[in-house]
Regions:
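Anionic N-terminal interaction surfaces
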Residues: 1-58
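Phosphoinositide-binding peripheral membrane targeting modules
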Residues: 52-59, 65-106
Length: 110
């Protein structure tokens, strides 16, 4: 196995771990994204960042394998369903680099 394959495997594992974490530890975010992208059955989270002030705010990137699109997201959670806010912005993949999303080279493995 060459170093590039190993690197891609590590990056793939990072994507899968991040997606698993969000789906189990931040289920409101996962549910909100699924509701916003109802025709997407394969969604993967990357670059998950949690607000350090305990405000239940999260941001990062989502890869929608169904449409081969990447979205930047911002999510503000709340105990009250009415106050949850999700912002999704589709990003032009061709303009992204590994400085934006470290896992970018591994997307083809999903």
């Amino acid at each position: 196995m060459d170093p590039q394959e190993l690197t891609n495997e590590v990056l793939l594992e990072s994507i899968l771990d991040c997606t698993h974490f969000v789906s189990h530890e931040v289920p409101n975010l996962f549910k909100s994204v699924k509701e916003s992208l109802p025709h997407s059955d394969k969604i993967f989270f990357m670059n998950f960042v949690e607000d350090e002030n305990g405000e239940d705010e999260y941001y990062g990137y989502i890869y929608d394998k169904t449409t081969a699109a990447i979205y930047e997201y911002y999510f503000q959670d709340s105990k009250s369903l009415k106050n949850r806010k999700l912002s999704l912005a589709k990003i032009d993949i061709s303009k992204l680099t590994t400085k934006d999303i470290l896992e970018l080279p591994a997307l083809h493995l999903l």
